[in-house]
Structure formats: C-alpha cells, structure tokens
Amino acid sequence: MGVQGLWELLAPVGRRVSVETLANKRLAIDASIWMVQFIKAMRDEKGDMVQNAHLIGFFRRICKLLFLRTKPIFVFDGATPALKRRTVIARRRQRENAQTKIRKTAEKLLLNRLKDIRLKEQAKDIKNQRLKQDDSDRVKKRVSSDSVEDNLRVPVEEDDVGASFFQEEKLDEVSQASLVGETGVDDVVKESVKDDPKGKGVLLDGDDLDNLVQDSSVQGKDYQEKLDEMLAASLAAEEERNFTSKASTSAAAIPSEEDEEEDSDGDEEILLPVMDGNIDPAVLASLPPSMQLDLLAQMREKLMAENRQKYQKVKKAPEKFSELQIEAYLKTVAFRREINEVQRSAGGRAVGGVQTSRIASEANREFIFSSSFAGDKEVLASAREGRNDENQKKTSQQSLPVSVKNASPLKKSDATIELDRDEPKNPDENIEVYIDERGRFRIRNRHMGIQMTRDIQRNLHLMKEKERTASGSMAKNDETFSAWENFPTEDQFLEKSPVEKDVVDLEIQNDDSMLHPPSSIEISFDHDGGGKDLNDEDDMFLQLAAGGPVTISSTENDPKEDTSPWASDSDWEEVPVEQNTSVSKLEANLSNQHIPKDISIAEGVAWEEYSCKNANNSVENDTVTKITKGYLEEEADLQEAIKKSLLELHDKESGDVLEENQSVRVNLVVDKPSEDSLCSRETVGEAEEERFLDEITILKTSGAISEQSNTSVAGNADGQKGITKQFGTHPSSGSNNVSHAVSNKLSKVKSVISPEKALNVASQNRMLSTMAKQHNEEGSESFGGESVKVSAMPIADEEITGFLDEKDNADGESSIMMDDKRDYSRRKIQSLVTESRDPSRNVVRSRIGILHDTDSQNERREENNSNEHTFNIDSSTDFEEKGVPVEFSEANIEEEIRVLDQEFVSLGDEQRKLERNAESVSSEMFAECQELLQIFGIPYIIAPMEAEAQCAFMEQSNLVDGIVTDDSDVFLFGARSVYKNIFDDRKYVETYFMKDIEKELGLSRDKIIRMAMLLGSDYTEGISGIGIVNAIEVVTAFPEEDGLQKFREWVESPDPTILGKTDAKTGSKVKKRGSASVDNKGIISGASTDDTEEIKQIFMDQHRKVSKNWHIPLTFPSEAVISAYLNPQVDLSTEKFSWGKPDLSVLRKLCWEKFNWNGKKTDELLLPVLKEYEKRETQLRIEAFYSFNERFAKIRSKRINKAVKGIGGGLSSDVADHTLQEGPRKRNKKKVAPHETEDNNTSDKDSPIANEKVKNKRKRLEKPSSSRGRGRAQKRGRGRGRVQKDLLELSDGSSDDDDDDDKVVELEAKPANLQKSTRSRNPVMYSAKEDDELDESRSNEGSPSENFEEVDEGRIGNDDSVDASINDCPSEDYIQTGGGFCADEADEIGDAHLEDKATDDYRVIGGGFCVDEDETAEENTMDDDAEILKMESEEQRKKGKRRNEEDASLDENVDIHFGNSSAGGLSAMPFLKRKKRKN
C-alpha cells in the first residue's frame, strides 16, 4: 500500500530513464507485491484467475529483466511486523466479506438462471398449447371419438348410487380389446407415454386420443372404429405397467374369474373395465390385498387422467378450475389412504399383535409405541373391559384401516382426554372399539380407514363428568358422528400442566409411491361411543368411487348449542362426505376438520381455537387425574429417543432438493389462546369471509392446498356461511416439511360457497411431494411493531418467508379475524405479496410463503410457554391478485427474459470483481516462483520482515544500484534510487532519486515519515480528514522535532475565538496579511524564527475550522511507527550476490508442464532473451544519455507550491524553486480579467513580508503599476507547458479553505518535441541589461511596436529568450510561476538578494530543461546592481534596437546553456542552430 498520495507528490521530481541505461545495473526487485498484482489482474474472459498466473507473470518479467541485461536480485517478504499485522487483519476481513458476497451473488446468479429457464419453459408451453389446440380442432372435424370419450371417462359427479358398475356388453368389449391390446398398437401408446413431460402416460381425453390417431400415419378411416377399441384397452394395460408403484385410492370391480386369473399369473395385467356406475366395496374387500392395491392404483391413475382432461376444459374459468381441483384433490387423498392401509395389510408386519413401523432412525430399527402404567392401570382397564368386549365381538374384519402417522405424546404433561361412556348409543358397524393382545383399547373408524390408538386409562376420572354433560347434546345429532368429544377445559388443562405444554403435532405423510411406505409411530386411541353415520361401509365406498368426499361431522347442527369441549392431546382428521340423498343436512353440519401434522418435539401444546356464541356452556370440571412420577420419567425418556430420531432424520433429509414444482406457503402462528376463547368456535360472517379470502387464500388456478391448511367452510342450520379457522403448530425443527395433509375437505363446494366467493385453492397431483425448505434469511423489513424477514432460496422460483410477531391483546384473546392488529398484519402481508407479484418491479416469484411466527427460536417458545398456532397453505402456483393476469403474455415473458439477461451480466461483473478481491497469495505460490528463479540462475533473498526495508538496506550497503518497486514505503526505509513502472510497454522507466526529493521538494526521510503518519501507511492508519496538501502544510508549519505532538495539542485545544481572547481579532488580521504573503510571495524559506511562528499562526488561523473534522488516533504520534521505519529488522549480511546462466532445457520442460506451451512458443520467448543476455557490450544510442532529463509532471496547485517552497528552510527554498521550474514549458496565450489584475495588485500591497522586496523592485522599475500588471498577466500564462497531454490531478482528501486551488500534476509524454518549433522568433539580448529591456517591454504594453510579441500556443515570444550564462541560477520569478505550479504573478519579478550561483548538479539533473527564455534573462538581471540595471534600461530605450543587443549578448556568452535543454543535451542544439541562423 505504501504512503497514501506520496507517489503523486513525488511525481514532479521523477524522471523518465531509457531502459537501455539499466544495463549491467544490480537491481533489488521487490517481488512480494507482484503476486497480488498477478492474481488480481490475470483473468480469463469468465473472470476466473488464469491457471498458474503467478508463474506466467514471473516468467515474463524475468525474461524482460534479462533481456535488458540487468542483474536482478529478488526480495520476498518475511514475517509481518506487529504494526502491520493490524492492517493485514483488516484486509483479511475485507476478503472474507468479499467471499460472503460471492456466495450471495452466486445464489442470485443461480436464481436468475432458474427463473430464465422457467420463463422459457412457460413460453414454450404456451406455444405448444396453441399448436396442440389448433391440431385438435382440425382432427376433431375428421375423427369422431365420442364413443371412446364416453367409455374412458370415469364419472365423479354421479349421484345415482344404485347404478351398476359394469355391464355385460362392456365386459365383452374389454375382453375383445384386451386381445387386440397385445398387438403393435401398444408401441404407439408407449411412445405417447414416453413423450409426456410429466411422466404420466395417461391419455384419456378426446384431444389426446385424437393426437394419437393423427401421429399414427398408417391408420386410416376404415380402421378408426376398431382403433378406438384397441386404444381403450392398450391404454389401461400400459398405464398399469408403468405406474404400479404409484399410490391411488379408488374402487373398481371386475368379475371374480378375472381376479383369480390375474392372481395366478402375476405377469399379466389387470384390464380395468369401463364403468358407468360405482364400485361394490364388498367385492373389492373380498379380493386379495395385492389385487386391491393394483386395482386402486389403476383407478387413481385413470382419475388423474380424467382430471387433466377436465382441467383443459375449464382452464379459463378460475372459479370452476379451483372447484375441480379441490374435488380431485380430496378424492386422491382418500385413494392414497386406502392404498397405504392395503399396503400395510399386504406387508403383515406386527409384533405381538401391535403394528410396527420404522421412525426416523436406522433402517433396521423399529419402535412399538406403548406405555406401561403402575398401580391403577389394571383396575382402570378392567372397569372398561366388560363393556368393550361386546363391541370387539361386533367388529368387522373387512375394514381397511389407516394408522395415524407421526403422533407424539406430551413431553411432561399430557392433556387429558375424556370420552363419553354413557352417551346415547347410535350403533354403527363402521365404528368399533376393542382391546388388543396387550390390553390396550383401540378404535377403528372404517369410514376413514383410520385407526387411531392412544392410552387413555389415565383419563377415566374426567370421562364420567364429561359424558353426562355431553350426552344431552349428542342425542340431538342424528346425522353425524362426533369424532372427538368431551375434552377438558383450559382450566383443567392448566391444572394438569402449569409449567410447560408441548406439542402433539401429527401429520399424515404423503406418499405418492407404494414402494416407499411411511414410517411412523403408531399411537392408539380408544373410543367407545359412536354417532349416527352412513348406513354401512358399502355406502362409503360408493361415495369414494363416485368421487364424493366422506364427511364425519364433529359438531352439532346448531353452533349456538355447541358445548363439546376439546383439548389438544390428539389431532383428528375428518373427510367431508358427499351424501347424495341428504346434502342439505350435511351442509348444515360442515365444521372445522383437524388434521395430524408433523411431529414437533420442542413446540408448545397444539391448541385448536374456536369461537362459540355460547362459551359459558363449557363443562366445568375440576377433577384432574394425577400422573405418577414414574410415568413422567418414562415419557421423558421416550420423548428424548424420539427427538434423537427426528434429528437423525433431519440430517439425512437436509440435502434433499426441492422439486421443480412451486408452492405458496402461508404460516400463521398465533400466541396461545386465552381461557375465554379456548373452546370457542370462531365463525366469520360472509363479509369477513370475503376479506379473508381476498387477503390470504386467493391462489392461481393450478395451485395445491397443503395438508397443513386448516381452513374449512362451515354452514350452520340457518344457512349462514362462514369460515372457521383452525390452527396447529408450526414444526420447530429445521427439517423439510412434507405438507400435504388437508383438512379443508368440502362436501359440495358449489352448494356451500358461491363461485365468486369460492376458496380458489386447488391441486396438481405432481405437486404433492414438494418439500418446503426454509433457507437463509436475507433481509428484514419492519412495519408497525412487527418484523418481516425475507429469505431467498436458489430454486426454480423464489420463496419469500415473512415472520410477523403477533401478540395477544390485553384480554389475552387470540381471535384472528376479530383482532385489528392481526388484520393489519395480514394487510401488510398482502401488500408484500402484491409487490412480489408485480411484473414491472419484480421477476417471476411463484414461490411465496408468508410465515407469521411469534418466535422463530424454539428455546424462546419453551421459555415463554407460548402455545402457537400455524395456518399453513402450500400451493403450486403464484398468488393471483386482482388485476394480475393468470398467465403471462409472450410480451411479458420476453421482457422478463431481457431483464434477467441484464441482471445476469451485472451480477457476473460483480462476481468477478469480488473474486478478485477474495483471492490471496499462498506459500505454495512463493515456493514455485522461487524455484523458477533458481532455474533462471537469479539470486533471491527472503527478508526477515519487510522486503522494502531489506531492499533499502542492500542499497545503503552498496549491494545493489537501485530498487524496483511500486511501494512508496521504500523511501521511508531509506532508499536512494527507486525505479518504477519498469515493466510498462515503453522505452523508458520512471526514476526517483532521494537527492532530488531533498533538494527540489525539501522532503527528507524524517519529514516523509511524518507525512506518512499524517496520511496513513501500512504501519499507521493516519489522521482522518488530512490529505496530501494538508500534510505538507502541517510539516511546514510544525518543522520541529516534536512538531507532530504540538500539532496534536493545537488540534485538541479550544478555539480562541470561542474563549473570547483579545488577540483573536489580531490573529484574524495576521491571517489575512500573512496568508497574502505566503500565497503571493511564498518566501517562507530562510525566514527567521519570527517568520516561522508567523507561518504557524497563519496555518492555525486558516485551518481552525477545518481541524474540527480531523480525527486523530490515540497513539498519534507513535514513536513505535517512527522506530519501525528508521530501524527496521533486516538481514545485515553484506555478502556479494552471484548470477548463473538460465537452464534452457529445464525451462522448456517447465513451460510445457505449467503453461502447456510447446517448444516453439517457449523458444520464441527464451532464445531472444538468452541471446541478449550473453552480449558483452552494446553500443548505446545518444538519446539514452539525454533521456534522464525528461520530466513528466509538474504541480499546478498554489497550496502545494507554497508549502513545498518553504518546507526546507533558507537554502532549501532555492532548491524547491528548482523543482518548480522543472519540466518543459511553453507560454500559453492567456487573457487575464481586469479584476484578477487588481486583486493581484491589492494582494501585493497587503503583503507585509513582500513589502520590502517590492520596494526594492520598484527602484528598478519606472512604471510599476501597469507594467507589473502586464507582467503578471504574461507570467501567469507561462505556468503551462507547451505540450499538455496527460493531466494528473492531485486530490486532497481533506477539506480546506482554498477550494479553488486545484492540485494538478501535468504529465508530458513527449518533451523532446517541444524543441522543434519552426516559427520565427525575435532575437534576444543575453546580457545583464535584460532587466531594463524587460521593463521597457512591459511599459509598452499596448503599443503595436512593443518588443514583447504575444503568441499563441506552440509559439515562443521574445521574452522567452534563453540565457546562456554558465554561472546563472534559475530566477525566483520562475519559482513564483512554479514551473507550472501556478504561483501568484506578483512574485514573478526577481529578487536581487538571490545568490549568483549555479551548481553542476542543477545542470546534471536537467535543470532549466524547459525554462522560458525571458525568465532566464531575468535571472541575469537579478544578479546586477539596481543602479546598473536602471542605466542599462535607459540606454536600451534610447537605442530601441534589439538585434544588436542580441549580437552583443551572443559574443559575451560563449558558453551557452539553454533553459530548454538538459546538461549538454541534444535537445539544446536546435535552439543554438536557430540563433545562429537568425544572426
């Protein structure tokens, strides 16, 4: 890094040296910084670092050094000094931040690409659908497939229960088609199945059949009727072969003869007949389990195919589409449950009569969930044994139960469950209660195919009281069976578990494949009561086959009389029933259905919240069963084992990838309900229903509702429509959620909710296995008192998950719809969703999830004993807000693709930039580079600490002749000769000599160290707010050894103007006069102590306000930093270095292995290098000797000029002037505004320091006012050189009072061309009388015959004459012009007190290379006496002839050194030749 801004300050003293002059020089190469340059700069077109970039860079630079015949010595960094370690740590932190940004950028890139792919797929689908529709329309005109459609369609809305399932004529057609199905037509069907993008090989709608016929070009109209029959059979056969592993639930019946035939031969396929009626469940139950499984799978697939056909017809009607999706989804869920039960029956796994299943653990470990009670268990069991024996005898063994998966007991305090023993008996054969081999009560609900088990002996105390209360209300219900009854109230529950309430979170796993059976804990639940339900299991199967959902209501007819309490110990699942004969009754009894959810160990108790109008009817029972300590310990042990198993499952599933299908996830987590609202049922009116639908559940047409969605539509006896919300718990574990349990099962959607108000939630079967993952949070947004966090995940579409903190109101009520605060929350959520779906502001985000959570940390939930509720909706498509189209048009898609492409380009650029910053140098890179140096025969040294310090020591010990580095710290360590930019593709190299810096800038090593402490370097952070200009001024104003300490004291001292000191006004006056002195005259050098104090006071006054913005570190000024620069740790060995010869064969091998270069390419680089390296001597061109004098920059800042001139004391001021005159110059034609001249005159008069010298000048000038104004105008223009091509501005990071003082360093690329002007020039008299001539020329300012000829750029006037005297020094007038440093014009009249002395060093370093001729003439006049100058000026005015005076001057000055030439330089000859030609 070096010292900030130091290179810019040193640029004016730098020279461009021909690279040929480096021959045979021993150069110390600081190679440590090379490594960083190579790994950051050498990149391929993709932004990745070039392989072995460090070796390639070293190889090329070594070749150039050898080609120049230098003798390089490479120096590498060693250990990092303690002071520098801080900076290294900061840089490492920046790299780590860059790496973090790289990961985020990579995620954005991936998301961008996935979105792009998705958009292209959508565009392609739109195009294909249009083409397909056109083809279908054309084929329909030629092909009649009505019979095929009628035969292949499975009716789902058929209300006639008594319709026959099959007919003899249909069986004959199927039998005939099955024979034909083995022919070549099967290949056509296979090809169609293969081409299906969804992997579904079912083509049942007429359009698809028409496409099949069209693709079979060999078919003709004559065979059309026969082909239809063949397709009907072959489709069924092919479908069953390809999808036997897919779960389905339907019912079908075929003749028993065919059953036996298929069962005996497993290789044959079961051909499903075409059905016009429903299936007889008795026939289905009599079949073997394997055959039931096959038939159900076939039925499910056919139903899915028919659904797709229906979707196409209603795809443009969102309401109908959603209703169709809901109906289809509910049927497929029921089918899947039946398949799961059949699968378990076929497996036959049981231990001791108890069904076993594997939970999240090892593959060969299974758990049997049971509990053993001490003491009262036998007594309690015997009390119920006699009563349940009778029910067990009545149990039918033809049911197909489905076990509840993933049920968990309470951790410490289970909520009690009380069941009704004395309730009115409505015997139903479908509900059976029995005792298994272990003496456990079990209940079977054959309607649902659900078997729920749980130990309830501990709850018998509460049952008696609850039964008496519930029996009255249960007697009123003749149509429904209450699936849950008589649960404890909240008061009793709180008595039971005052400390902690954990979650019983159940979820029925969604298994689309029969090959992957679910693994779960089976929990048995007893029930000895029943209600009126459907007559028999046949009716249930009829409803399933007909497509109608089955409803088992858990409420009474009138919600006002609802007194059934409940508790969260168990989760129940209900499926709506489509009862064809009594739909109106079912409508009045629709209610909330609760579903099992995933196990959540660390969550609070799962509460189900209802609001009822008669909450006071809740049963008040203080009887609580006492739980023994042994039971609690056993439960805790079991809970721990389950938790470990779940953690293992989470680890295994953490790498699972989300499917392509998207889902919309809405999780609403609410605080625990209050006592008043515990058993309340919240029914929302019609108006609130619309608002709820608009805000939460408006989904696109192809959506899928989650199993965690607990929203259902309820209707009361009065016909009032409402929405009842039910909440479970959001899983606390971070594992993936398979959220497909649906409690929103509607018996007749159209009969309950109008299409306009329908819940637009539907499903696609391919979406059912979507895994919901929560990924890293990226941002948060706060509104109100709630926090919203948004997270992005690298999937096909973006998922946004928001967390909103919701708090209970003052009364503890957690009613969602009645709480204004939560209404506000939902409105915020809705606005967030709307923004994310806005195509103009955001790309397609079809994965949007909004999760409302009171606390995302499980530990906080346990500590706060919060009971939270989750409302979760998963959908496969986007939200469809009002005004947002369902489908993007092609124009919108193209626009989105264009935006994504632009974003991809910008993100790629950002990633490449971050990758550059993230790369670091390794030790292996250094080792490889050092090995390369050995092959070339080049010595190298590893410094103990800093490579720059070692290079400086080697130069001081005369081990090397110069140092090649780009780090300005080398000057602080004591370097004398530094070469920079040696590897640029130019013929020169920049050189910096410390002697030039000391003489021309007045900056010694100590002063540069002080500036480094002000500006900041590798060892110190510097002072915030101080730039290069202020640093020079500080060093100038505080030149003492302890100047920096005094500077700190001054900055920290109070402002004297605030204290109201008497000298404050005087100080401001001194500021004005002193600043004018320094600004205009700049004569700080050689000043006395009083002058130094005055300069310091001027600095303080000018920077008092600015200093308030300077932030000084606590350790400033640090002696440790100064010591580290003055006494660095280096290798003190002075042993001479030796160089070897490059090994060509080894280099060729290395190039082949590392760079993949062939021998030809290697030789092209190495052979010229070796040839040049072996040369003994070379003949240099003459230009090489003069190129040292080429200056390439000059300062254009008044403030830098002023500070530099006075930075080194009396004698250093002259040397500083040398710096200011360096650089080729030419005078620009410049017009000075009148007010500028007046300002300059005024500044001269106000200057206290310059008054005395100005008076002396006035003695030599007859017309001081006008001529001086003219002279100032002319001199002001001379600050610019002839060629101004490259301008480098020195920016001062600090704020200062001189805002208009721009610091510019002018770089001149071709100074040699400045000497080739072909314009005519007037002769100049080179004599001591030049001052008089100058005065006269100034006096004749406006005369046409004035001696001074004003020229434009590129032309030199007669006052630009060159003085040829050997003993002449540069004039102070030129100093004041700054050699381009823009000094004030008043200083351009030379002082007579300057010494008449010229040094050889000045000529050697190229002093006066581009000095204007008139200024050199002025330098002569300054050495003469004032009286002589006056006499000569009078004589000059009398003669009026300048040519004779020029001749005399040429005669007197035999030895001429032109100001525009170097010491004996070739560039001076054109001027000499022109002068002679003019004579």
Swiss-Prot record:
Name by which UniProt lists this protein: DNA repair protein UVH3
Cofactors named for this entry: Mg(2+)
Enzyme Commission numbers on file: 3.1.-.-
Subcellular location, principal: nucleus
Tissue note: Expressed in all tissues at low levels.
Entry GO MF terms: DNA endonuclease activity; metal ion binding; single-stranded DNA binding
Highest taxon above the source species: Eukaryota
Keywords for the protein's UniProt record, in alphabetical order: DNA damage, DNA repair, Endonuclease, Hydrolase, Magnesium, Metal-binding, Nuclease, Nucleus
Region (N-domain): 1-98
InterPro entries in alphabetical order: 5-3_exonuclease_C_sf, HhH2, PIN-like_dom_sf, XPG-I_dom, XPG/Rad2, XPG/Rad2_eukaryotes, XPG_CS, XPG_DNA_repair_N
Annotated Mg(2+) 2 binding sites: D967, D969, D1018
Subcellular location: Nucleus
Compositional bias (Acidic residues): 256-266, 1294-1303
Family annotation (SUPFAM superfamilies): 5' to 3' exonuclease, C-terminal subdomain, PIN domain-like
Region described as I-domain: 934-1022
Biased composition (Basic residues): 1269-1282
Task of the protein: Putative single-stranded DNA endonuclease involved in nucleotide excision repair (NER) of UV- and oxidative damaged DNA. May make the 3'-incision step in NER. Seems to play a role in senescence program.
GO terms classed as biological process: non-photoreactive DNA repair; nucleotide-excision repair; response to heat
Gene Ontology cellular component terms for the protein in this record: nucleus
Pfam families given in the database record: XPG_I (PF00867), XPG_N (PF00752)
Region Disordered, annotated ranges: 128-150, 239-266, 384-425, 548-579, 854-877, 1206-1372, 1418-1479
